[in-house]
Amino acid sequence: MAAVEANGTFQANTKTTEPVRPLANFPPSVWGDRFLSFSLDTTELEGYAKAMEEPKEEVRKLIVDPTMDSNKKLSLIYSVHRLGLTYLFLQEIEAQLDKLFKEFNLQDYDEFDLYTTSINFQVFRHLGHKLPCDVFNKFKDSSSGTFKESITNDVKGMLGLYESAQLRLRGEPILDEASAFTETQLKSVVNTLEGNLAKQVMQSLRRPFHQGMPMVEARMYFSNYDEECSTHESLPKLAKLHFNYLQLQQKEELRIVSKWWKDMRFQETTPYIRDRVPEIYLWILGLYFEPRYSLARIIATKITLFLVVLDDTYDAYATIEEIRLLTDAINRWDISAMEQIPEYIRPFYKILLDEYAELEKQLAKEGRAKSVIASKEAFQDIARGYLEEAEWTNSGYVASFPEYMKNGLITSAYNVISKSALVGMGEMVGEDALAWYESHPKTLQASELISRLQDDVMTYQFERERGQSATGVDSYIKTYGVTEKEAIDELNKMIENAWKDINEGCLKPREVSMDLLAPILNLARMIDVVYRYDDGFTFPGKTMKEYITLLFVGSSPM
């Protein structure tokens, strides 16, 4: 095997002739073995669970309080949702919202200010009710058709309208206008603001709540919205205890997958790959943070780490001949195929087959082996997709945009990650749920498209510099004869419309339960987190480092 320099690049061994390899020189891990040393104190974990009982009951009573004003009730539910506590009171919240939605009267909103209207709109839309966007009509000037100048003096209201606009659907031009208008206005005043309002506006402009990672958004909410939280003392108390409880559980999960990764010795056998265990765990945590999904997170993290090894082998080390052999071996999925692949990748291949076999064996006992098979088939699909990309690169071929997207939706890794996320979710992922996934519904297509194009828009220059296969940006330019800026603008419009389709799919009546839709929505959110401003996975020193520090390194809030 080739020697490795300190900077991570491979050099040809002087004693043997090494093939020319497309080395990427990925940055090393930011974290090293930091998370291996964590030791879970179960007494502390149980202490937080017990301490949550009293404030949880107090918050439950507030939610069901029949004497509370409806706007105050919706404001309370809004804070509960922003704090990541909805799942603790799901039945109570749904009952309250069902009742309030049935009582909805557009004329009532004539009396509400912009902030109240926005909060109510967000609560209903976030939790599945299609409150009409007509509630914002009164804030537009009837003669000019634009938003009234007077609302520019209400920064809190404009912030609420900006967040509301992220929940828009196709055919809601007032919210398209609201998004552009409020973004411009908020950017013009943000540097004049002070205190928590300044933090709230900066946070929202950087990434609106609806596009954010739920755990991080919850952590920042009780830091930046203490006034909203402090109306009811039990709410911030519960939120902080809840965060601390989850933090302990999740640090233990991160320790488990970090130890597994180290024991598998991938950094020794395939040292050219990106060492990104905490980043992958963070990515999966973004799909579901609730305690009941602990096993699911561990399983999905391991499978996604397999994907990193595969991706970097195809993209940053293997020759085209080696890629063809490895793809064939993955298609065969048989230990006897190990003899045909290069020696450096054999340990990975064996571990891959062994881990999937063990998963299938364990879930077969529960009658749920089909979810493992679906994940395995998605893994085989992506290997074939990576081969297609490699063949294009090898021949210098730039695919047409439709051709690129057909393969690119596979190589985005969305299908592998989303199906692997189902494996450990338990009884809710039965044959009907898998059949729904396999039908490739519109909501899934939209999230998948975001996964592909958000990545392309952010990474196309880096990929060009490395001489890798053309991205969606390059294919769009070639196919439609547009400039680079025009291509990026068009891809961003496609991303924007895909978000509208996801929003529509999460409204009642839903095709499947929100338990199944949430990972789809959240995977789109995590793509935004990782790729909005940079390639946060390849170069994790900014956003992902900040988020990992906030959730696993920084001190807990109590």
Curated annotation (Swiss-Prot):
pH dependence per the entry: Optimum pH is 7.0.
Domain notes: The Asp-Asp-Xaa-Xaa-Asp/Glu (DDXXD/E) motif is important for the catalytic activity, presumably through binding to Mg(2+).
Binding-site positions, Mg(2+) 3: 455, 459, 463
Entry binding sites for Mg(2+) 2: 311, 315
Residues reported in the UniProt entry to bind Mg(2+) 1: 311, 315
SUPFAM superfamilies per UniProt: Terpenoid cyclases/Protein prenyltransferases, Terpenoid synthases
Cofactor (UniProt): Mg(2+)
EC top class named in words: lyase
Gene Ontology molecular function: germacrene-A synthase activity; magnesium ion binding
Textual note on the cofactor: Binds 3 Mg(2+) ions per subunit.
Family: Belongs to the terpene synthase family.
UniProt pathway annotation: Secondary metabolite biosynthesis; terpenoid biosynthesis
Reactions it catalyzes: (2E,6E)-farnesyl diphosphate = (+)-(R)-germacrene A + diphosphate
Motif (DDXXD motif): 311-315
Keyword Magnesium: yes
Transmembrane residue ranges: none
UniProt entry keywords in alphabetical sequence: Lyase, Magnesium, Metal-binding
Annotated tissue distribution: Expressed in roots and in green and etiolated seedlings.
EC numbers, comma separated: 4.2.3.23
PANTHER family found in the cross-reference section: GERMACRENE-A SYNTHASE (PTHR31225:SF120), OS04G0344100 PROTEIN-RELATED (PTHR31225)
Pfam families named among the record's database cross-references: Terpene_synth, Terpene_synth_C
Keyword Metal-binding: yes
The protein's name in its UniProt record: Germacrene A synthase short form
UniProt xrefs under InterPro entries: Isoprenoid_synthase_dom_sf, Terpene_cyclase-like_1_C, Terpene_cyclase_plant_C1, Terpene_synth_N, Terpene_synth_N_sf, Terpene_synthase-like, Terpene_synthase_metal-bd, Terpenoid_cyclase/PrenylTrfase
One biological process term in Gene Ontology: diterpenoid biosynthetic process
